[in-house]
Every structure is written in C-alpha cells, then in structure tokens.
C-alpha cells in the first residue's frame, strides 16, 4: 500500500511539474515582451540548375515562362515553407518582389556545386541587410540558394528536386545550411510542383525551427 501511495505521489508530482512548465511557456508567449522569431525567405535569381534540363525544356514541359522559372520555383517553395508553420515560436515570411533590395540580393554569392550549395553574404553591406530585415520585422534571412534538378535514368527514371538553403542572422552570421529533396517521374507544372514539394518544404521549416530552438 505504501508503494502504491508513493507511486501515485510521484506521478502527481511529475504531472504538476509538466503543467507548470507548459503554463510558463504559454505565459511567455502571451507576455508583452514575447516576439516570435521571424524569418524572411528570399530566392536568388537564376538559381534553377540541372544536370540534364535547360530552361527551354523546363518551360516547354511545365508551362512556365522561360524567363521566370527561378521566380516560380522560389515562390512555390517559399510559400510552402511558410504555410507549413501554423503557429509557434517561428514565422516564415516569403519576400515579395520589392522587399529585398539589389544591394542585398545582387551581392549574395553562391558557392559549391549541384546539391551542395551554400550562400555567402560577405559582400552584402551589413547595414543594408539589417534595413531589409527590420522593414520586414524579421530576425533572420533564409536564402534559397539553388533548386537542382537531378535526372537519373537508372535504376529507375527519377527526377530529384534538391533545394539547398542557408540561414543567416542580422549580423550576416551563418546559422545553418542544408538541403532537402523530393522526387517525381517528370518535370511538373506549378500546381503539381506545389503539391509534390509540400512535405520537403515542411521538413526545411522544421529543421530551421529546431535549430533556432537550440540557440
């Protein structure tokens, strides 16, 4: 009987601790000083690359305009990332066409090849980056470095869509870099691409959220 009482007391204690911790977290979220971490997403120009397809082929197969393929891919992935996070400590903001100035966008360099790409902000003026982030009420910049369309014939005909990305803080420090991919049988039109890339985009968001939670 004593052991049973002790067990119940122990369980009640841990439940109480868990409840207090949960309430404390909620109180923090509701407090005047609470601010969800906001991440501005920007896709680079001419960042759709492939080991097989060229822009004319992509345009013909997908119905996209050849001169806006990069914009279409960037928009779809950015919007999927943002839509995958309904609430919580992070919010993703897809940048619009005028939100990121040329002094920032045009100075971002991409290093690496194929699926292993990462961005370099060393040439970006720090004050310009901070101005862009402040205007968007954002704390971090997520750069979609490249969409690499990797085609393979063997063992199965498969198209890998590999999205590489880099996360920076306001001081141009790299916080995280990585990539994620999804597969399909052929090039897809924008509507199908949006659907096919949802799970992969959600994984990018969850990886970034986990990284920022560890800071």
Language model features with spans:
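N-terminal segment of the mature soluble domain
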Residues: 54-141, 177
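Sec-dependent signal peptide hydrophobic core
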Residues: 8-12
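Hydrophobic h-region of N-terminal signal peptides that target proteins for export
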Residues: 13-22
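Conserved short hydrophobic patches within well-ordered secondary structure
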Residues: 17, 142-143
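Short, small-residue-biased leader/transition segments that mark boundaries at the very start
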Residues: 1-6
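C-terminal/domain-edge helix-coil "capping" segments
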Residues: 25-53, 132-137, 148-215
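Short, well-ordered beta-to-alpha junction loops that form the rim of enzyme active sites
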Residues: 44, 96-98, 145-147
């Amino acid at each position: 009987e004593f052991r049973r009482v002790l067990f119940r007391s122990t369980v009640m204690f841990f439940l109480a601790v868990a409840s207090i911790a949960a309430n404390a977290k909620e109180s923090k979220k509701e407090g005047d000083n609470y601010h969800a971490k906001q991440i501005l997403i920007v896709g680079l120009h001419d960042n759709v690359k492939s080991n097989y397809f060229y822009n004319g082929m992509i345009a013909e197969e997908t119905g996209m305009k050849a001169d806006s393929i990069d914009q279409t891919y960037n928009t779809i992935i950015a919007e999927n990332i943002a839509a995958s996070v309904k609430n919580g400590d992070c919010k993703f903001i897809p940048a619009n066409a005028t939100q990121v100035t040329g002094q920032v966008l045009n100075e971002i360099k991409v290093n690496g090849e194929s699926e292993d790409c990462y961005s370099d902000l060393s040439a970006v003026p720090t004050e310009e980056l901070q101005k862009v982030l402040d205007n968007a009420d954002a704390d971090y910049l997520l750069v979609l470095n490249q969409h690499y369309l990797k085609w393979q014939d063997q063992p199965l005909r498969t198209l890998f869509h590999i999205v590489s990305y880099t996360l920076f803080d306001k001081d141009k420090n790299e916080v995280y870099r990585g990539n994620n991919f999804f597969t399909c049988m052929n090039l897809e039109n924008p509507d199908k691409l949006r659907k096919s890339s949802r799970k992969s985009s959600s994984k990018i968001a969850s990886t970034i959220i986990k990284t920022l939670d560890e800071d």
